[in-house]
């Protein structure tokens, strides 16, 4: 990777010609609101979100895959997991489960963060390698205070018997320095669906953070942050196992320099380290004993950093680096003995080193980045033991793919970039953009090695995959049309070498494998807002279509037309709202692996909510979700493998009364 540093050095000696500049924030590109959503969490969390993925459903165009009561997996424009780059206070997070129990957003306990930023698609190159679906960034924003500030809160949800207690305090250490402590604890039981069943959806989480920061003499800011997240006994009816525990330690150091340094007018430096230890089994919560008992300890450890320098007020250049190590061991009870089966993730190390440049002017924005990605397993040939069902990862790859397929170090040279033209149109702001995004396949897609004596339970990566290449054209508009405030976008994404999962020989009873195909994804998002007789009326609509062009079939896990219609009355101290959440029928699916092999019915579900602020420091909220106690599931929800039997999705919760109280002093 040494050649990257030479290229990086050349970028940093570029002379910039003088031109009329726009105001640019180094941490976030300037763009139309159709492509970026920067939200205060307390403003969009109207129903006590259980985690970051659940919270994101409040943003138009973001859906979620439900596998249980916690760990909701966000989907943006038909893309999820490693097609989204997710940051927690600047730290890039990779989950520790190949079955996606713990998408990165599940480690964001929303009571402990201040804001979330969502960028849809490739509209910036500042946020790491890949991420063709978009960027999700949860942030805490802390500044010096003159006296201690306290906030305490209590949330409840009647259906699952869920209670969350949270607290936040900021202490002044001097006129420029501060100490912030915050934390939360949640316990939830099994929620009841509209049909009256209670799937295994209970969970327990705790989270706390320590932040120490100071303003330096030139106004620059230095901050260190430690976060601890603990999840215990998290049930997943949509998976074969549950979380026994998942423990996360996260460290970040941030330096934002506001005074010039050489050619740079400002500079951001961020370093991070995240360690996740995770144990899943089918014994702790399901009571499985004897033969068939399974447990899998895993880990995902990531460290890295980024340096971004602003040249003038309209250009940013930088470098970022990530190093992730994933390990997982597959174990099973046989003949009354614990048997080590194989390395599910065979000690895989993934490194990403990128350089980038991004520029904004009054009417045009563009960016370019180059990433060198190296992914290498280290235990692909570990001795498999004496039993016939035990194989080394390399033996398993060769067993399920044609020819001799073995794991080796993979290197990818990826180029991504975008160009966006902004223009005033019809009393509003419009844009059109063209982007290219190359994403290297992840650890699971390349080297997963789950074996089983039952063929369809095998889940095997493909060491010979190529990088995806997304080419997207997008257009958007924000302004007034026919008395409505409109915010919308349309997009068309053509993908070469899209990584898809499939069944061996296209047989639903055979192993789950991976391959590259050509694919297209296209759709739209639109928000219309209007004040009618003192009632704020907001309509959100989003639609995505995904096609596997190589196999002439739909892509899996694509949400149909969906949205919500909200009526809200607001005053200085109160708000009252009624919301209709709805989705169309989805009859386009690929039932071989991820989708259930039948269509999903449409639905309409009704919520009411209200908020009260009797004093500036005290706020109450109360509401009821799914008022009619309707049984429904979104098309994205995983199959319920415990209660409901074959071809039945994990249902959404039934009727629930929820509320919160927050007091600041």
Question: Could you tell me what each predicted segment is?
Answer:
Residues 92-120:
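Short acidic/polar hinge/loop motifs at secondary-structure boundaries
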Residues 43, 52-55, 72-75, 87, ...:
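N-terminal periplasmic accessory domains that precede
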Residues 239-265, 297-302, 344-350, 400-418, ...:
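Outer-membrane beta-barrel signature, preferentially recognizing the C-terminal barrel domain
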Residues 491, 496, 584-589, 611-665:
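C-terminal beta-signal and adjacent terminal beta-strands/loops
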Residues 21-55, 73, 81:
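N-terminal periplasmic "start-of-domain" segments of outer-membrane beta-barrel proteins
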């Amino acid at each position: 990777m040494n050649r990257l540093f030479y290229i990086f050095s050349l970028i940093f000696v570029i002379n910039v010609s003088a031109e009329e500049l726009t105001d640019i924030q180094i941490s976030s590109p300037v763009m139309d609101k159709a492509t970026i959503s920067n939200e205060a969490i307390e403003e969009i969390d109207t129903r006590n979100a259980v985690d970051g993925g659940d919270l994101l459903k409040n943003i138009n165009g973001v859906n979620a895959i439900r596998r249980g009561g916690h760990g909701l997996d966000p989907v943006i424009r038909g893309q999820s997991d490693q097609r989204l780059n997710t940051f927690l206070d600047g730290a890039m997070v990779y989950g520790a489960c190949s079955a996606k129990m713990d998408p990165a957003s599940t480690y964001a306990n929303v009571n402990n963060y201040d804001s979330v930023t969502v960028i849809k698609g490739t509209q910036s190159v500042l946020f790491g390698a890949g991420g063709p679906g978009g960027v999700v960034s949860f942030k805490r924003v802390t500044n010096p205070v003159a006296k201690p500030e306290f906030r305490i809160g209590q949330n409840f949800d009647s259906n699952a018997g869920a209670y969350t207690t949270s607290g936040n305090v900021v202490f002044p250490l001097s006129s420029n320095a501060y100490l912030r402590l915050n934390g939360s604890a949640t316990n939830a039981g099994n929620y009841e669906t509209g049909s009256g069943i209670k799937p295994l959806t209970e969970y327990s989480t705790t989270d706390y953070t320590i932040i120490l920061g100071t303003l330096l003499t030139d106004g620059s800011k230095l901050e260190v942050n430690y976060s601890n997240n603990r999840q215990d006994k998290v049930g997943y009816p949509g998976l074969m196992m549950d979380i026994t525990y998942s423990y996360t330690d996260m460290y970040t150091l941030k330096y934002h320099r506001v005074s010039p340094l050489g050619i740079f007018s400002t500079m951001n430096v961020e370093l991070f380290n995240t360690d996740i230890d995770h144990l899943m089994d089918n014994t702790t919560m399901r009571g499985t004993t004897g033969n068939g008992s399974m447990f899998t300890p895993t880990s995902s450890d990531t460290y890295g950093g980024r340096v971004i320098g602003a040249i003038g007020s309209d250009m940013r250049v930088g470098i970022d680096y990530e190093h992730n190590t994933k390990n997982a061991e597959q174990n099973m009870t046989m003949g009354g003995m614990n048997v080590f089966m194989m390395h599910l993730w065979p000690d895989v190390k993934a490194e990403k080193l990128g350089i980038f440049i991004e520029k904004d002017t009054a009417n045009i924005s563009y960016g370019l980045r180059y990433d060198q990605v190296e992914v290498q397993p280290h235990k692909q040939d570990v001795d498999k033991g004496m039993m016939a069902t035990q194989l080394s990862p390399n033996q398993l790859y060769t067993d399920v793919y044609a020819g001799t397929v073995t794991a080796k170090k993979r290197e990818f040279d990826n180029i991504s970039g975008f160009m966006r033209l902004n223009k005033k149109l019809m009393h509003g702001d419009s844009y059109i953009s063209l982007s290219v995004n190359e994403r290297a396949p992840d650890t699971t897609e390349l080297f997963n090695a789950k074996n089983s004596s039952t063929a369809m339970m095998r889940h095997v990566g493909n060491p010979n995959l190529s990088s995806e290449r997304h080419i997207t054209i997008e257009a958007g508009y924000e302004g007034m049309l026919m008395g409505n405030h409109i915010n919308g976008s349309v997009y068309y994404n053509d993908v070469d070498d899209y990584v898809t999962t499939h069944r061996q020989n296209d047989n639903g009873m055979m192993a789950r494998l991976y391959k590259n195909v050509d694919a297209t994804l296209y759709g739209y998002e639109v928000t219309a807002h209007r004040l009618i007789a003192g009632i704020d009326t907001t309509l959100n609509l989003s639609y995505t279509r995904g096609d596997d062009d190589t196999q002439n079939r739909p892509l899996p896990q694509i949400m149909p037309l969906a949205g919500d219609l909200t009526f809200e009355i607001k005053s200085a101290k109160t708000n009252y709202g009624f919301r209709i959440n709805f989705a169309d029928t989805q009859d386009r699916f690929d039932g071989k692996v991820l989708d259930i092999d039948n269509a999903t019915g449409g639905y309409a579900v009704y919520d009411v909510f209200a908020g009260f602020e009797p004093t500036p420091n005290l706020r109450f909220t109360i509401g009821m979700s799914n008022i009619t106690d309707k049984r429904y599931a979104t098309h994205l929800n995983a199959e319920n493998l415990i209660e409901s039997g074959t071809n039945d999705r994990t249902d959404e919760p039934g009727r629930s009364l929820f509320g919160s109280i927050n007091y600041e002093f």
